[in-house]
Amino acid sequence: MARPDLHERISSLRKLRVAQERVRVRRQVGRRDGVRLEIDGRWLTGFCSNDYLGLSQQFEVVAALQDAAARDGAGATASHLICGHHTAHETLERDIAEWLGYPSALLFGSGFIANLAVQQALLSEEDDVCVQDRLNHASLLDATRLAGCRLRRYPHLDVEGAMRQLKGAPEGAAMLASDGVFSMDGDVAPLRALSLVARMQEALFYVDDAHGVGVLGPQGRGCVADAGLGVAEVPLQLVTLGKALGGYGAVVVGEEALIRHLAETARPYIYTTALPPAQVAATLAAVRLARRDDWRRTRLTELIGTFRDGARRHGFELMASDTPIQPLLCGEEATVMAMSAALEQAGFLVGAIRPPTVPEGKARLRVTLSALHTPQQVQALVDAIVQARDVVSRQPQRALA
């Protein structure tokens, strides 16, 4: 039997994506100024980034990056366990652990890498199981598959479903893993109830709080702190550095023994170059600002209210989200693509999210807000969405859900 030809395979898959109008494209950003982006020679107001606190271009953050780059160069030049672990890395790990109330922390190159590292290092036996919310981020779900342990999923936010899945897999070590804030819906996991399930079933509870830290909880400490939980209930927690903190990378905070085990055994940590010290210095500055500047969270909360009030007045279907992620359901893919195109024509860049990222029939505009937006910009976006809906609804077989 002849082997499949990989070029023929990818050609067939490409043709299928084209037929389904599911080809993904990259937009080239020429320049950026706060929430404004230059794309194809036009300046657009962006409502699609994860820079929730507006820190990525903040003066102190950029100055810290420039100063460290002038001193330490462009890269770490080695992995953490060779000679790539600089003083800045150690300081950032310590500061984030202290901020979140955890004893220890470990830096990673990205949230995807960190989620893989956690599961590969802790769930190494065939009988081990990771129980997950069905709408968890792809990095959590893919990490389980790559780690080689069993994956069991429960319906979104279904605490009883999580209990059933853990009870149904009594052999081997168990982890219960959940997003804190769900990236496509913007809702928050029932962490207190899930922590009780994990304790009852002797499972380690792991929370990926990529979209919560910096935004929610006292001093922006995230979903876990906002739920009144800590290391006793959530022994491991993921924090990404490329969203509210405006930089790049990720940190896992947790019990000292667990973090030490990751540092000594997690292959994605051991066999990769450490983050550039200059990037780490920028994140150190961002952490200080995120902890100090409650006004950023206050403004963000006000802007979320402005958007939701305006959308409700015009009859839009909102999801149960009080976070900067505000999805507007559009239903069919053709509708959301037409809406997104109409908004861009009006001067706004809003992400169109469609299957397979979200379920069939649940395509949506994913509006994300930043503390740098103004109330006037948010109101202008709402007005533009109303106009786009009116235009699109007049087109055959295209109506908002």
Swiss-Prot record:
Binding locations of substrate: R24, H137, T357
Pathways involved: Cofactor biosynthesis; biotin biosynthesis
One GO term (biological process): biotin biosynthetic process
Keyword Transferase: yes
Keywords (A to Z) from UniProt: Biotin biosynthesis, Pyridoxal phosphate, Transferase
The protein's Enzyme Commission number: 2.3.1.47
Alphabetized GO MF terms: 8-amino-7-oxononanoate synthase activity; pyridoxal phosphate binding
Catalytic activity entry: 6-carboxyhexanoyl-[ACP] + L-alanine + H(+) = (8S)-8-amino-7-oxononanoate + holo-[ACP] + CO2
Top enzyme class: transferase
Residues carrying N6-(pyridoxal phosphate)lysine: K243
Cofactor: pyridoxal 5'-phosphate
Keyword Thylakoid assigned: no
Residues that coordinate or bind pyridoxal 5'-phosphate: G111, F112, S183, H211, T240
Family in the record: Belongs to the class-II pyridoxal-phosphate-dependent aminotransferase family. BioF subfamily.
Family matches, as NCBIfam families: bioF
PANTHER family attached to this UniProt entry: 8-AMINO-7-OXONONANOATE SYNTHASE, CLASS II AMINOTRANSFERASE/8-AMINO-7-OXONONANOATE SYNTHASE
Subunit structure: Homodimer.
Function: Catalyzes the decarboxylative condensation of pimeloyl-[acyl-carrier protein] and L-alanine to produce 8-amino-7-oxononanoate (AON), [acyl-carrier protein], and carbon dioxide.
HAMAP family membership: BioF_aminotrans_2
Protein name in UniProt: 8-amino-7-oxononanoate synthase
Protein species of origin: Xanthomonas campestris pv. campestris (strain B100)
Gene name in the database record: bioF
